[in-house]
Design a protein with these regions (language model features):
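Short loop-beta-helix segment that forms the pyridoxal 5′-phosphate
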Residues: 140-146
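Short conserved active-site loop signatures built around small residues
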Residues: 151
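Short, conserved alpha-helix that lines the donor NDP-sugar binding/gating region
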Residues: 155, 159
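Conserved "HGTGT" condensation-loop signature of ketosynthase/thiolase-family condensing enzymes
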Residues: 1-140, 160-163
Length: 165
């Protein structure tokens, strides 16, 4: 263990409380609205190279790409080499929306209509892989899938790796 400090240099948030750090904070401080709490008015295409790439990503991955984009904008230019830069993401379940959609397609239209992208879209580690590839990071790419504690676990695991080097 070294005395190396871990610092957070950028944040990105896509949440039912708000998209972006300022909107998120305002949403946390405000009284919750009645009814469903969902992410609305979210256009994933602005965070992807093209609309097709966005469509071939589950909403979980779309949120991760958007949050990473926001965090990278705040961070600015990275000083670390890409082979030492990694991605640690925590998710409660990953691409469940894609799985649900494709089960409905299977039941209504048959197996030939199920998307060939089902498995790569629904994997919990799809978000981590997408962020790593988007930014060319070649270091560790770890996904933690531990329900509500996943984000905290991802931060702890990344912090441990940084301080162990």
């Amino acid at each position: 263990m070294t005395n190396r400090k871990v610092v957070v240099t950028g944040l990105g948030v896509v949440s039912s409380c708000g998209i972006g750090t300022e909107s998120f904070w305002e949403g946390l401080c405000a009284s919750p609205s009645a009814g469903d709490r969902r992410v609305e008015n979210f256009d994933p295409t602005i965070y992807f190279e093209n609309a097709k790439e966005a469509r071939r990503s589950d909403r979980c991955t779309q949120f991760a790409i958007a949050a990473a984009h926001m965090a990278m904008e705040q961070t600015g230019e990275l000083a670390a080499e890409t082979d030492r830069s990694g991605v640690f993401i925590g998710t409660g379940i990953g691409g469940i929306e894609t799985l649900e959609e494709q089960i409905n397609i299977l039941l209504e239209k048959g197996s030939r209509r199920v998307s060939p992208f089902l498995v790569p879209m629904m994997m919990p580690n799809a978000a981590t892989a997408a962020v790593s590839m988007k930014y060319g990071f070649q270091g560790p790419a770890e996904n933690t899938c531990t329900a509500c504690a996943a984000g905290t676990h991802a931060i702890i695991n990344a912090s441990r790796l940084i301080t162990s080097d």
